[in-house]
């Protein structure tokens, strides 16, 4: 995939000595928290001519490479440039249980995780799992989007709920959970 994807690693904190090349770009960054790293990565990705989509992924998150390939294909085929793909967060010690599948904003300006504690092993859960609800936020453990659809950047430093703010500022986005 080295000709189709670029991996931008924004290292917040102590510099690492890893040469960039072969589609890998390492950026040593002041430790400005997750949002600082994500925004720095977004700025750097915007400087690369052939980059159209990015995936924000926490350093402690994991996914299958196939998830990245399918997300890329999905975004390339999306007719709406405001389409965002977010991934479910599962419990690492019990991956059949969903922690969050996006979140829904309520009138009290709070967000509530969608499909929280849904057990994906249960047959009765399949209808609930497949029922796509309009969500207003996707966590940055897996958040993929078209960089040309971004109007506002988040703070370039950590603020609790920075991913919530980013989602709220871009609420016109059509967020899809895959």
Question: What are these regions, as identified by a protein language model?
Answer:
Residues 136-142, 151-168, 173-177:
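Donor nucleotide-sugar recognition loop
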Residues 20-36, 44:
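Conserved donor nucleotide-binding strand/loop of the catalytic core
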Residues 50-62:
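Short beta-strand-to-loop acidic/aromatic patch adjacent to the donor-nucleotide binding site
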Residues 1-27:
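Acidic donor-binding segment of Leloir-type glycosyltransferases
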Residues 66-112:
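Conserved donor NDP-sugar-binding/catalytic core segment of glycosyltransferases
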Residues 116-142:
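A recurrent flexible, glycine/aromatic-enriched loop bordering the glycosyltransferase active site
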Residues 7, 84-85, 175:
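Hydrophobic/aromatic residues located in beta-strands of well-ordered beta-sheets
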Residues 39-53:
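Active-site nucleotide-sugar/metal-binding loop of Leloir-type enzymes
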């Amino acid at each position: 995939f080295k000709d189709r994807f670029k991996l931008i690693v924004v290292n917040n904190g102590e510099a690492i000595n890893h040469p960039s090349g072969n589609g890998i770009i390492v950026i040593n960054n002041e430790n400005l928290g997750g949002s600082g790293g994500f925004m720095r990565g977004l700025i750097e990705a915007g400087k690369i001519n052939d980059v159209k989509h990015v995936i924000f992924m926490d350093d402690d998150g994991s996914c299958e490479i196939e998830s990245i390939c399918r997300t890329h294909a999905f975004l390339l085929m999306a007719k709406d440039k405001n389409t965002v793909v977010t991934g479910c967060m599962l419990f690492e010690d019990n991956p059949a249980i969903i922690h969050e599948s996006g979140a829904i904003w309520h009138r009290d300006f709070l967000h509530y995780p969608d499909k929280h504690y849904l057990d994906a092993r249960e047959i009765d859960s399949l209808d609930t799992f497949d029922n796509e609800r309009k969500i207003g936020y996707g966590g940055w453990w897996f958040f993929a989007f078209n960089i040309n659809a971004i109007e506002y950047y988040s703070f370039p430093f950590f603020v609790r709920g920075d991913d919530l703010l980013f989602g709220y500022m871009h609420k016109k986005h059509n967020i899809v959970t895959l």
